[in-house]
Swiss-Prot record:
Protein name: Cytochrome b
SUPFAM superfamilies xrefs: a domain/subunit of cytochrome bc1 complex (Ubiquinol-cytochrome c reductase), Transmembrane di-heme cytochromes
Keyword annotations from UniProtKB, A to Z: Electron transport, Heme, Iron, Membrane, Metal-binding, Mitochondrion, Mitochondrion inner membrane, Respiratory chain, Transmembrane, Transmembrane helix, Transport, Ubiquinone
Gene field: MT-CYB
Location, primary (coarse class): mitochondrion
Organism: Python molurus (Indian python)
Length: 371
């Protein structure tokens, strides 16, 4: 074994020749994670987890700290980039049947849940108006849990309402969870390379593999450069594009915003929650919108691994993508017609995709005459 065995390990890692640019998003997610930890640390150094000082400390960071505005914007926009990359990464996994590598898929979905929790805690920290009310609405869903709901909510809040203890514990969780994400990411990568990446054809790539470096590393580097360029353009010219106007006002428990909504990357789940007029039903649908991803490896019935040769599944997949976009858009609108019916239809279509996949697999097996 050579001295620089870790570098050699990555350099000589055998990878399928035909993996496309859709396989680049894993390394981009790793870069996003590194950026978030780095910028997050410098922000935490200047942040004060106190309900009277949190909002002022964010203003202090953006105005007085050298390059604080850049750190703050990179951290906020980096979170959006993180979710763009992870949603594309999951979509690629769904399309090309990567979920059949069960351990990797399960660890990946667990990572997604941890990431969503981290992002939610982070959204509360600026203690702006939308931060406060989004936290109130989402954490209040715990009261829908039978018997234990009220106790759980009081325990999470650290009192009978969202207050100073809530902000302190959310900051502590937002700081510690990224380290759990780093550990789980390492596990995810180890589990992936035990079997190796899938490929667009879904065939066994053992007969045709090339070293990861330089062939795929340069391809990854290109997309990484484009992502960083895209981020820097947003930071420099449109830094508030993902921000909610209400969040520029300090949290006021006495004034409710006209339309409470979380960050854009939670809107699909929030749209599903809002589409059900029952509190417990909505909370269950919200949880199931993510948890349903766990069952996918066990409902695969097609003999072909990817959707490359499965036209009906392709149709359903692109319906899911358009449903995801539509429900995200509908969740930004007030709860009134026609947005209520749009949310309900798209929420139903979202779950139909996962329910219909095994049935479509059997139909496609008949179409292709595979036993």
């Amino acid at each position: 074994m050579p001295h620089h065995y870790i570098l050699t390990l990555f350099g000589l890692l055998p990878v399928a020749t035909n993996i496309s640019t859709w396989w680049n998003f894993g390394s981009m997610l790793l870069a996003c994670l590194a950026l978030q930890v780095l910028t997050g640390f410098f922000l935490a150094v200047h942040y004060t987890a106190n309900i009277n000082l949190a909002f002022s400390s964010i203003i202090h960071i953006t105005r007085d700290v050298p390059y604080g505005w850049m750190m703050q914007n990179l951290h906020a926009i980096g979170a959006s980039m993180f979710f763009i990359c992870i949603y594309i990464h999951i979509a690629r996994g769904l399309y090309y049947g990567s979920y059949l590598n069960k351990e990797t898929w399960m660890s990946g979905i667990t990572l997604l849940i941890t990431l969503m929790a981290t992002a939610f805690f982070g959204y509360v920290l600026p203690w702006g108006q939308m931060s406060f009310w989004a936290a109130t609405v989402i954490t209040n869903l715990l009261t829908a849990v039978p018997y234990l709901g009220t106790t759980l909510t009081t325990w999470l809040w650290g009192g009978f309402a969202i207050n100073d203890p809530t902000l302190t514990r959310f900051f502590a969780l937002h700081f510690i969870l990224p380290f759990a994400i780093i550990s789980m990411s390492s596990l995810h990568i180890i589990l992936l390379h035990e079997e190796g990446s899938s490929n667009p054809l879904g065939t066994n790539p053992d007969i045709d593999k090339i070293p990861f470096h330089p062939y795929h590393s340069y391809k990854d580097l290109l997309f990484l450069t484009l992502m960083i360029l895209f981020m820097l353009i947003i930071v420099s010219f449109f830094p508030d594009i993902f921000n909610d106007p209400d969040n520029f006002s300090k949290a006021n428990p006495l004034v409710t915003p006209q339309h409470i909504k979380p960050e854009w990357y939670f809107l699909f789940a929030y749209g599903i929650l809002r589409s059900i007029p029952n509190k417990l039903g909505g909370a269950l649908a919200l949880v199931m919108s993510i948890m349903i991803l766990f069952i996918i490896p066990f409902t695969h019935t097609a003999h072909f691994r990817p959707m490359t040769f499965r036209p009906l599944s392709q149709l359903m997949f692109w319906t899911l993508v358009s449903t995801f976009i539509t429900i995200t858009w509908a969740a930004t609108k007030p709860v009134e017609p026609p947005y209520i019916i749009i949310s309900q239809v798209t929420a139903t279509l979202y779950f139909i995709f996962f329910i219909s996949m095994p049935l479509l697999g059997w139909i496609e097996n008949k179409m292709t005459n595979t036993p």
